[in-house]
Amino acid sequence: MHFIKNRLKNVVRSSIRRMGYDIRKQDLIGQDAYLDIRRIVGSKSPVIFDVGANAGQTIDDLRKVFPSPTIHAFEPGKVAFDSLLQTHSKLPHVRLNNLALGAKPGRQIFFENYRTDMSSFLPLGPDGWGYISNQREIEVSTVDRYCSQHEIPIIDLLKSDTQGFDLEVIKGAQGLLNARKIRLIYLELTFQKMYQGIPPMDEIYRFISDQGFELVSFYTFYYLNERAGWTDALFIHPQFQI
């Protein structure tokens, strides 16, 4: 009977594979970033920074897994922020900031793409898409400065999706990192030249690792020209292990 069951499983799996699918045992970790974040954080009301909020996709995902999160969202693009205001301005405990975060305070040229999710402080590279519809000088603050101004002692989750600018965002949180006041970092890692001057993935990974963080998991990989294009990665400081 055991032999028959195994043979039947193999036949079914082979048939499914021929259709381009597979059957795998699901691990507890690494399947859904937001479920992993909820499990690690534990609190029902975490403090979250959503840097590169765009149209509020991450806000929506976080509110599905946390009953009452406090979310500080940052979106420097004018078109994207206007849309964000219309859809998310009345949500409780969500603060929308038309502001960029980087490594140091100042002003910097921002390239707004007609595809708002491709807007960046970096010019488009050979693997990027869309086109620049506007470029303007905008204010840049830092995670450290914002937390000081708003008396935020700790960040449970620092999420950054800023199209090649994520390393600068994390560098701007050096004070909190040194004080061990950030529990999780969730960011996009890019493998192709979507922007000019984008730092290589290993440089970002090394910087985060040097702050004492450890990788929880990579999540969905997206592909360009049959090569890895980008993915999201979650890091935890071992001080906050569950």
Specify the residue positions occupied by each region the protein language model found:
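Phosphate/nucleotide-binding beta-alpha loop and adjacent structural elements of enzyme active sites
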Residues: 1-242
